[in-house]
């Protein structure tokens, strides 16, 4: 689904699940090569020719070490390779179980990205994790420049396939489980945001911790996006958006409280646009995980900003770059956005009333009192946890 067409497989016992899955895939050419060094350079040549990552598979132990020269060559010459090394589970490591070495970060600093996957588990949550990790690995092998990605995959026995009716497997997946997987990356010099996927829908913009070089330009860009789509903006306390709140009438700061209310059931969006990191609010994160709607992540960095492993699509550009050449349109406030803004106003009044009537001092009230009484524009430094 990402776009892989070729897998080079070095046969071995521990990599049996990978070999069979790739060999049985109708759209992947699986090529078996016994010698690992030869296989790795063949995969390198194939990737050079196609411009797409070639998947290279081997079993546990020293097999993966034979890929090392090709890994260095691929990284130095900018060739996309995705290496899958099978491994024994944790309980069979460091105990002379045989055909076992430390395969974590086997190739040092040469890969663009590397990680060890969790043990396979037939649950929707873990399959979502696997889906998003594979999508991220594919993107890392191609962007910002082509190179090597190494995934270490532990497997427990039994390694051979277990017969299971296809219908049982298919019922585990929601109809849109694979919908957000795209087989290409946006062009490096121009990011085309999917306005047609967003306009006319109920949606939110969420913005986490950010330290942009030009905070006002960053806030103006998000305010522009918000008002063009009539999407409310749920802004992290440590985001500069709250310092420039006058730029955007759709700014929501009390979302953590709003999402604890019964009214949150009526606020489920069709689209979520995430700018940078997720806000730290556990309430927001749990809500996003429960609703699991398509999420579009906009950030210039190539990191994976999806700890929820949801249906995400990444745009590797800053929010200001992403909105270059976008023409403004006059759009009225949508009923969905009005709901959020109304709840924001009500919740703010309730919070102020509660803190005003509260006689006992605590961290939350101290921060609120300071913000109410200091002159506008006065810098305030708040420590961790409750006060923030």
Mark where each language-model region is.
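Thiamine diphosphate
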Residues: 16-91, 280, 388
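Glycine-rich, anion-gripping cofactor-binding loops and their flanking helix/strand elements
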Residues: 207-296, 304
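Conformationally flexible catalytic loops at phosphate/diphosphate-handling active centers
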Residues: 136, 140-200
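Glycine-rich phosphate/diphosphate-binding loops that line cofactor/substrate pockets in enzymes
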Residues: 1-4, 46-51, 140-145, 191-204, ...
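Short acidic-hydrophobic, aromatic-tinged amphipathic segments that line or gate anion-handling sites
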Residues: 33, 113-119, 250-259, 312-326
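Phosphate/pyrophosphate-binding active-site segments
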Residues: 287-388
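Conserved thiamine diphosphate
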Residues: 99-147, 322-323, 328, 334
């Amino acid at each position: 689904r990402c776009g892989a067409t070729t897998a080079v497989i070095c046969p071995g016992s521990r990599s049996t699940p990978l070999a069979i899955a790739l060999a049985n895939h109708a759209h992947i050419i699986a090529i078996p090569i016994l010698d690992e060094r030869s296989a790795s350079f063949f995969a390198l040549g194939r990737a050079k020719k196609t411009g797409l990552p070639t998947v290279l598979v081997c079993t546990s132990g020293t097999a993966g070490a034979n890929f090392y020269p090709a890994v260095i060559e691929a990284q130095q010459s900018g060739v996309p390779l995705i290496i899958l090394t099978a491994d024994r589970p944790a309980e069979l490591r460091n105990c002379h179980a045989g055909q076992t070495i430390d395969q974590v970060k086997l190739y040092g600093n040469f890969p663009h990205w590397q990680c060890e996957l969790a043990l396979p588990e037939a649950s929707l949550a873990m399959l979502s994790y696997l889906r998003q990790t594979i999508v991220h690995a594919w993107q890392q092998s191609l962007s910002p420049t082509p190179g090597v990605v190494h995934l270490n995959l532990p497997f427990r026995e039994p390694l051979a396939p277990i017969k299971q009716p296809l219908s049982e497997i298919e019922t585990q997946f929601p109809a849109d489980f694979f919908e957000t997987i795209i087989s290409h990356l946006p062009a490096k010099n121009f990011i085309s945001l999917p306005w047609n996927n967003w306009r006319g829908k109920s949606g939110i913009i969420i913005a986490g911790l950010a330290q942009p070089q030009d905070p006002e330009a960053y806030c103006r860009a998000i305010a522009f996006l918000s008002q063009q789509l009539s999407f409310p903006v749920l802004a992290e306390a440590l985001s500069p958006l709250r310092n420039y709140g006058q730029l955007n009438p759709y700014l929501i700061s009390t979302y953590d409280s709003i999402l604890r209310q019964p009214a949150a059931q009526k606020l489920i969006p069709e689209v979520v646009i995430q700018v940078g990191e997720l806000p730290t609010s556990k309430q927001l994160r749990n809500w996003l995980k429960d609703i699991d709607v398509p999420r579009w992540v906009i950030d210039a960095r190539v990191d994976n900003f999806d700890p929820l492993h949801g249906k995400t699509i990444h745009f590797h550009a800053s929010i200001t770059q992403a909105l270059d050449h976008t023409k403004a349109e006059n759009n009225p406030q949508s009923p969905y956005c009005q709901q959020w803004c109304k709840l924001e106003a009500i919740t703010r009044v309730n919070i102020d009333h509660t803190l005003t009537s509260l006689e006992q001092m605590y961290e939350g009230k101290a921060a609120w009192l300071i913000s109410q009484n200091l002159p506008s524009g006065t810098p305030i430094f708040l420590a961790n946890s409750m006060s923030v």
